[in-house]
């Protein structure tokens, strides 16, 4: 009896978290349509979405969020894969150095923001060092990396956090593939880097794309770094939603949920695109496998025919 219950007991925490997540999601979507009985709002309406889409700063905020999330995910993915390749080809995929590289993963985003402010602001450590060496005439000449309208500080913050995550996410699979198939290709005469780019890297593609999607969706919906490192204008979508959520008039709560609804839709579209890409790749692999099997059967039948003709 205990053995039968063990799997369900192990799944219980995950099921509980899933229920809480789904309940919160449903509540948020319901509130975005203006249904909050506690505040006297009982009639479903699209008014809040219409007013959100009529806001002059919405387009700017959407583009800013997509830019910071997309660049952060792209740079973290490219840098993580490049570093994984160097480690795998150098045979250094474990040990203390890897543990040190992965340390930023456990650092909260708020702490990351404070670290970057103390390091990269015009009154920060980097500006003081450059000024002390005489490379800048005063600290105000230091480049505006924090609170700038291009989101450079936000991107740097996500890059510092998510690049180690990408390394952690990919390196184990990449090392296992290279150790088995990559080394087999090298033994058959392929150059090490040729085997890596032709065999190891393509087989890691799905995992790399999954990591990119995770980073992109997270950076799109998180508000800590855009709130602490971003400029007053433009504001990222999560920051706009947070400001509406803290509005003194509680009847403004549906505006915050409508902004969150826009973030959810963008995330779902990204996931749908990823799913379509994966399905297309699987179909191509299936078709190529069927073609190889068909050509193999034809080759065997032709050989049998030649053998039969020779016997005749």
Residue ranges and their predicted role:
Residues 1-2, 27, 71-102, 114-118, ...:
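Transmembrane-helix boundary motif in ABC transporter permease subunits
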Residues 2-4, 49-57, 227-276:
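Interhelical loop and adjacent transmembrane-helix boundary motif
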Residues 11-22, 103, 107, 160-170, ...:
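Transmembrane alpha-helices
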Residues 21-56, 230-232, 285:
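Short membrane-interfacial helix/loop motifs at transmembrane-helix boundaries
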Residues 24-34, 166-169, 207-240:
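Non-cytoplasmic
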Residues 34, 171-182, 254-302, 307-311:
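C-terminal transmembrane helix and the adjacent membrane-cytosol boundary/short C-terminal tail
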Residues 46, 113-159, 193, 229-233:
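Membrane-interfacial helix termini and adjacent extracytoplasmic/periplasmic loops
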Residues 138-186:
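Membrane-cytosol interface at the C-terminal ends of specific transmembrane alpha-helices
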């Amino acid at each position: 009896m205990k053995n039968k219950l063990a799997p369900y007991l192990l799944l219980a925490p995950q099921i509980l978290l899933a229920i809480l997540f789904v309940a919160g999601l449903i509540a948020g979507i319901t509130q975005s349509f203006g249904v909050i009985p506690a505040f006297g709002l009982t009639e479903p309406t699209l008014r809040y979405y219409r007013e959100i889409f009529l806001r002059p700063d919405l387009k700017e905020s959407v583009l800013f969020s997509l830019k910071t999330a997309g660049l952060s995910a792209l740079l973290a993915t490219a840098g993580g894969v490049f570093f994984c390749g160097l480690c795998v080809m150098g045979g250094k995929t474990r040990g203390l150095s890897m543990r040190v590289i992965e340390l930023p993963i456990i650092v909260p985003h708020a702490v990351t923001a404070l670290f970057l402010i103390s390091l990269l602001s015009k009154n920060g450590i980097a500006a003081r060092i450059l000024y002390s060496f005489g490379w800048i005439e005063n600290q105000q000449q230091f480049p505006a990396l924090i609170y700038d309208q291009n989101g450079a500080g936000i991107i740097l913050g996500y890059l510092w956090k998510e690049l180690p995550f990408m390394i952690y996410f990919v390196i184990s699979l990449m090392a296992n593939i290279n150790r088995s198939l990559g080394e087999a290709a090298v033994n058959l005469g392929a150059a090490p880097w040729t085997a890596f780019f032709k065999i190891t890297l393509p087989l890691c593609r799905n995992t790399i794309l999954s990591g990119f999607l995770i980073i992109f969706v997270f950076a799109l919906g998180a508000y800590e770094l855009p709130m602490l490192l971003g400029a007053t204008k433009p504001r990222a979508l999560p920051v706009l939603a947070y400001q509406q959520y803290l509005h003194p008039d509680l009847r403004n709560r549906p505006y915050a949920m409508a902004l969150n609804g826009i973030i959810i839709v963008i995330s779902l579209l990204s996931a749908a695109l990823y799913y379509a890409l994966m399905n297309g790749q699987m179909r191509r692999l299936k078709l190529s496998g069927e073609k190889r099997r068909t050509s193999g059967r034809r080759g065997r039948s032709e050989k049998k025919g030649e053998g039969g003709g020779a016997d005749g």
